[in-house]
């Protein structure tokens, strides 16, 4: 009996993406093997953390790196590192640090909720959030005006959750931060390029280990050596509650080692198969859509005409979730009549099942 049956947990066909609430990723054989082997022995955790940092830094082309429990933990730790500088007295004070220099500047459009509000991560790291600009507009002078002697860092977010309209480009914010001798912390949780942002000049870059990298629940921080050392010091303070087990560290190393070996051809094959299968369904307009945040991700886009289908996109999405098998779509724009099917977490065999289920639901409603 498999664990899903043993504990009565339903499997899901994930057409939504690398979502935490759906378990983020499916692990490869190599990652599972690394985790299994890690679970058979004891290890000196400090040595493992050192070696993991060296390996990750090599792949990210950064001065140094460290493992963390996830991208949200990475934000907390990075903020704490920028504020404390690794001073052990201050490390023990986080999040209630007794210094004035703890302001973290972030654009209003980047104050996202990824399942928890980013402002809470800043606060847990001891930071005092300073918001600049408005939701749909931010200029360099907004940042300039906010910087003062009590500013510890600037936090920038690369995410599909963030508003993309009329924001200051990352390259310009990096230049601005360095002009004022401030570290630029980048939340790149689900980003796919693990070298680009270090090469651009970001001081700390945070990635999820379980999203694009397809590793176990984990995260990593890459960047300047002095700041990474300060990040590591947080394990004596707030990061103690966010420690990572040896199994997940080895799993992350296996994932990053094989990263980039996955072919995008299979993903495009899935998208094309969905478009071909559903293009003749009345009331659906089906096409291929590129990721709106600019990543090289292509998804099947379903536009639901309620007057023809007898239901809107929200209703279709709900029926897919409530059916058997359970199917999750990428429903961020369901209120606008749009559902996306993301091929990255899908198996080719899922395609026929998902398309058939959509046809069945719409056939009943017509």
Named regions from a protein language model:
Residues 47-48, 244, 332-333:
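Short coil/turn segments at secondary-structure boundaries
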Residues 1-27, 53-68, 72-260, 272-280, ...:
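Conserved PLP-enzyme active-site core in the AAT-like
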Residues 3, 283-359:
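Conserved C-terminal alpha-helix-loop-beta "cap" of PLP-dependent enzymes
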Residues 263-271:
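Shared catalytic-loop signature of beta/alpha-barrel
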Residues 20-31, 42-49:
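A structural motif shared across PLP-dependent enzymes of the aminotransferase-like
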Residues 360-366:
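Generic C-terminal helix-cap and adjacent flexible tail
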